[in-house]
Amino acid sequence: INHLGGFFAMILVMCVVALVVINNNRKFKQKREQDNVDTLFRQLVRCHDKAETWQLLLQHVRRTQTDILEFTRNTFRNITQGLMHENMKFLRTASHDIENEKGIWKRYRRKEILGMRKIDYLVAVEKNTWFHLGCNNATQIIYGLKRMLEPCVEHVDNNFSPLPQDYVDEFIPVCNDVDHFLEVAQRMISTGNFEGVDELLVEGNAIKSRISQIRHAQQDRIQREDSNIKIALLYLSTLQETQELMSAARHILRASKRFQT
């Protein structure tokens, strides 16, 4: 028995160490990416050639939009997994990341607005709409994820009844579709290769339509069935925020294409 106890204790320690290493690696990667973006901005500020300044700004916006979609993928996954599996650790991670991203994104946006003032006037006029469309929708995503998170935290933290399995079975394919869209959009933006972007935008619109159908079906269920109203409304609001997230992500992709090309 003592040997078994020691074995399980060792396994527990190894799991804790593995989680610490994974978390530290994630933080190191985030810091390295932010340092790279900051270095790029310093180069942009020192540059006096307008054409070169435009290329530096283009790289900066490409990186920050890539970062926001990576943040969106990770945070959406943590929120939905935390809700479906009643895992407060995932939800706390999402909460921390959202607060962190709010500060990071404000700094990025402020720097890029300065960059827009340094490029050629005609280029700035041409790209201004697409720049602000991307920025505004990135901000919408951050605050939309916060709205999605808050009722999930309240639900799981208070040990309310879990999501019914039929909700989970219905929602998992939606989560997978959203994740795939964000992954491909992130790759397009980071590489500047927008081949197939029109098809991806159509796919994104189809995902939005499927979520809308599920939302309407859920509204009908709430009116028709004698179910747990709190859980039913939580699921409905999660679907609503997911649909809004998809809409904003599509706008970012479309804006990035027009800004970069």
Predicted regions and their residues:
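Cytosolic, long alpha-helical scaffolding segments
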Residues: I1-T261
